[in-house]
């Protein structure tokens, strides 16, 4: 009878079993990834690929999904520009329709276009005024944090804020010393 160590048992029995379980888990995850990408892409071609091709295709697909999010974030960061572009496209469309409509009064078209231009200008001025007010408010908030409010007796000069108010000094009493 031959004596077998735990290491030999592990190498003969456990290690192959653990490797089979690991491969089965990997294959299950690859199948899940394959079906998920096929559903999201709307393309069943990935289902017929081998594992390496499927992984490459999944990586490419995920990179493509990552790119539009950056574009969407840039669009969200500039809503006013998006609005301006949309408004101008609408104005151009109105102008085109009025020009191509037979029997359209020139005076009516002129007044409509003047009105649309005036509204656009008012919107721009409102946005600029609001931006300026926000800027002023932010700068005032920052500058007022550093300084104490001026008293009514203050002259209003900057030097009033820098110098601390003179504090009354207590009367010095002679200090008792034992010698």
Curated annotation (Swiss-Prot):
<dbReference type="GO" id="GO:0046982">
    <property type="term" value="F:protein heterodimerization activity"/>
</dbReference>
<dbReference type="GO" id="GO:0043565">
    <property type="term" value="F:sequence-specific DNA binding"/>
</dbReference>
<dbReference type="GO" id="GO:0005634">
    <property type="term" value="C:nucleus"/>
</dbReference>
<keyword id="KW-0804">Transcription</keyword>
<dbReference type="GO" id="GO:0007498">
    <property type="term" value="P:mesoderm development"/>
</dbReference>
<keyword id="KW-0805">Transcription regulation</keyword>
<protein>
    <recommendedName>
        <fullName>Enhancer of split m8 protein</fullName>
    </recommendedName>
</protein>
<dbReference type="InterPro" id="IPR050370">
    <property type="entry name" value="HES_HEY"/>
</dbReference>
<keyword id="KW-0678">Repressor</keyword>
<dbReference type="InterPro" id="IPR011598">
    <property type="entry name" value="bHLH_dom"/>
</dbReference>
<dbReference type="GO" id="GO:0001227">
    <property type="term" value="F:DNA-binding transcription repressor activity, RNA polymerase II-specific"/>
</dbReference>
<feature type="short sequence motif" description="WRPW motif">
    <location>
        <begin position="176"/>
        <end position="179"/>
    </location>
</feature>
<dbReference type="GO" id="GO:0048749">
    <property type="term" value="P:compound eye development"/>
</dbReference>
<feature type="domain" description="Orange">
    <location>
        <begin position="83"/>
        <end position="116"/>
    </location>
</feature>
<comment type="subunit">
    <text>Homodimer. Heterodimers with dpn. Transcription repression requires formation of a complex with a corepressor protein (Groucho).</text>
</comment>
<dbReference type="InterPro" id="IPR003650">
    <property type="entry name" value="Orange_dom"/>
</dbReference>
<dbReference type="InterPro" id="IPR036638">
    <property type="entry name" value="HLH_DNA-bd_sf"/>
</dbReference>
<keyword id="KW-0221">Differentiation</keyword>
<keyword id="KW-0524">Neurogenesis</keyword>
<feature type="domain" description="bHLH">
    <location>
        <begin position="10"/>
        <end position="65"/>
    </location>
</feature>
<comment type="function">
    <text>Participates in the control of cell fate choice by uncommitted neuroectodermal cells in the embryo. Transcriptional repressor. Binds DNA on N-box motifs: 5'-CACNAG-3'. Part of the Notch signaling pathway.</text>
</comment>
<dbReference type="GO" id="GO:0010629">
    <property type="term" value="P:negative regulation of gene expression"/>
</dbReference>
<dbReference type="GO" id="GO:0016360">
    <property type="term" value="P:sensory organ precursor cell fate determination"/>
</dbReference>
<dbReference type="GO" id="GO:0042803">
    <property type="term" value="F:protein homodimerization activity"/>
</dbReference>
<keyword id="KW-0217">Developmental protein</keyword>
<keyword id="KW-0539">Nucleus</keyword>
<keyword id="KW-0238">DNA-binding</keyword>
<feature type="region of interest" description="Disordered">
    <location>
        <begin position="146"/>
        <end position="179"/>
    </location>
</feature>
<dbReference type="GO" id="GO:0048813">
    <property type="term" value="P:dendrite morphogenesis"/>
</dbReference>
<dbReference type="Pfam" id="PF00010">
    <property type="entry name" value="HLH"/>
</dbReference>
<dbReference type="GO" id="GO:0050767">
    <property type="term" value="P:regulation of neurogenesis"/>
</dbReference>
<dbReference type="GO" id="GO:0000978">
    <property type="term" value="F:RNA polymerase II cis-regulatory region sequence-specific DNA binding"/>
</dbReference>
<dbReference type="Pfam" id="PF07527">
    <property type="entry name" value="Hairy_orange"/>
</dbReference>
């Amino acid at each position: 009878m031959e004596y077998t160590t735990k290491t030999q048992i592990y190498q003969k029995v456990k290690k192959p079993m653990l490797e089979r379980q690991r491969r089965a888990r990997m294959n299950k995850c690859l199948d899940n990834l394959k079906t998920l990408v096929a559903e999201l892409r709307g393309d069943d071609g990935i289902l017929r690929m081998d594992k390496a091709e499927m992984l490459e295709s999944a990586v490419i697909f995920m990179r493509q999904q990552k790119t539009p999010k950056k574009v969407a974030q840039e669009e969200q960061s500039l809503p006013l520009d998006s609005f301006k572009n949309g408004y101008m496209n609408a104005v151009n469309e109105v102008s085109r329709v009025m020009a191509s409509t037979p029997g359209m009064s020139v005076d009516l078209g002129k007044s409509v276009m003047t009105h649309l231009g005036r509204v656009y200008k008012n919107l721009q001025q409102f946005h600029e005024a609001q931006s300026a007010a926000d800027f002023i408010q932010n700068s005032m908030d920052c500058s007022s944090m550093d300084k104490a409010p001026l008293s009514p007796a203050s002259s209003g000069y900057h030097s009033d804020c820098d110098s601390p108010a003179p504090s009354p000094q207590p009367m010095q009493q002679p200090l008792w010393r034992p010698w």
